[in-house]
A protein has these predicted regions:
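Beta-alpha junction/loop-to-helix N-cap segments that form part of ligand/metal-binding clefts
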Residues: 27-28, 34, 47-54, 66-143, ...
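Extracytoplasmic "Venus flytrap"
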Residues: 29, 36-57, 83-89, 112-113, ...
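Extracytoplasmic ligand/sensor domains, especially the bilobed periplasmic-binding protein
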Residues: 54, 90, 105-209, 258-283
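Surface-exposed patches in mature extracellular/periplasmic domains of secreted proteins
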Residues: 68-73, 77-78, 177-180, 315-321, ...
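Hydrophobic alpha-helical
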Residues: 114-121, 125, 231-253, 326-327
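Extracellular/periplasmic bilobal clamshell ligand-binding domains
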Residues: 224, 230, 328-352
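Extracellular/periplasmic periplasmic-binding protein-like sensory domains
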Residues: 250-324, 335-336, 340
Length: 352
């Protein structure tokens, strides 16, 4: 009996030791800091999912090549485990569970879109896993009291409210009429709320308030009404596919409005895809290469854009740039925390 107890105690000790080792190595394997990310590589958000992944990879390569992350007197390099969330919120939540519970990831990068970020945030919060996200701009993400969710971008309600202000300014300070068409996702609905606030603030009038179809492939019904009612401003938000559909059908149906304000113009590569038909669209953006901000890793926007194009073969949209910024934020937080303890890293992120 005593021998059995000794054997049982020895086995239990091995189990505890093994479990502790797995937990430790999950966050740092040798000299690598393992981050997890569920990204839309297929489905309706796939183009922006690729932009997001490319931005992450660009920053990982740059940080690693410039000395990595210094914690506790040692140097570490970033690595990322990716899974395809298929542009599906349920799948994104499942993959977050997998990354944390099975792969042992203790630090997460966000997905693309507010809807998928909204699906993942409760999972990372439950496990106390810090997540830095770069592409979930919905205001509702930041009103739920999450303590482990951090973002590098401005909220969606600030994307196109300035378009209404500009239209009023160009109308000699007089109110304008506004037509709107929005996707039924968290991001676009927050953009809509910002536009509605601007309409109210300026005394302007909403004359069309339509929902874009789920597949974002046809907005002819809205455009027929626009031709009939002749609003001063047409506002559209439907991610990349919605932007492409809008420009294509506006040209096909010969719709003419004094101002067209949209989201996702650069991600959709409108100027390349639709040429002159995309000219004069007023487009919201979180970043542009001509901005004068500088840092020690990418120098400035023009240099970042040139390096990105050399690596991936196209001019970076803001989704890529803000994704790169998420890695810089994580590096800074790890080094200020001087630890891989999740709570300490979380506190460092909160102080950023």
């Amino acid at each position: 009996m005593r021998l059995n107890k000794i054997i049982l105690s020895f086995v239990s000790a091995l189990v505890i030791l093994f479990s502790t080792s797995v937990a430790s190595f999950a966050k740092v394997v040798g000299d690598k800091i393992i981050l997890g990310a569920a990204i839309s590589l297929t489905g309706k958000y796939s183009s922006n999912g690729v932009h997001t992944q490319n931005g992450y990879n660009m920053a990982v390569d740059r940080i690693n090549s410039m000395g990595g992350v210094k914690v506790g007197g040692k140097t570490y390099k970033f690595d990322i485990i990716y899974y395809d969330d298929e542009s599906n919120p349920k799948r994104a939540a499942q993959l977050a569970e997998r990354l944390i519970s099975q792969d042992g990831v203790e630090f997460m990068l966000g997905p693309y879109s507010s809807g998928l970020t909204k699906a993942i945030a409760p999972v990372t919060e439950k496990y106390g896993v810090p997540m830095v996200e770069a592409n979930g701009a919905s205001r509702s993400l930041f009103t739920k009291g999450y303590k482990y969710l951090f973002a590098v971008l401005a909220p969606a309600n600030l994307y196109l409210d300035v378009a209404i202000d500009l239209a009023v300014e160009k109308n000699n300070g007089k109110p304008v009429t506004v037509a709107m068409a929005f996707e039924q996702d968290a991001f676009s609905q927050d953009v809509r709320l910002g536009v509605l606030d601007a309409i109210k603030r300026t005394g302007s009038k909403k004359v069309i308030d339509d929902k874009l179809p789920k597949e974002l492939n046809d907005m002819a019904a809205t455009l027929v009404k626009v031709k009939q009612m002749k609003p001063d401003v047409l506002v559209v938000s439907g991610h990349t596919k919605g932007a492409l559909t809008a420009i294509r059908q506006i040209a096909e149906m010969k719709v003419d409005v004094p101002m067209l304000a949209m989201t996702h113009c650069d991600a959709a590569k409108l100027s390349k895809q639709h040429g002159k038909n995309s000219q004069y669209a007023l487009c919201a953006s979180q970043w542009h290469k001509t901005l004068t901000y500088k840092d020690n890793f990418f120098k400035d926007g023009m240099t970042y854009a040139a390096d990105f194009e050399k690596e991936f073969g196209y001019d970076p949209p803001y989704q890529s740039a803000e994704s790169s910024a998420a890695l810089l934020v994580f590096k800074d937080a790890f080094e200020r925390a001087n630890s891989f303890d999740q709570k300490k890293v979380r506190d460092a992120l909160a102080d950023t």
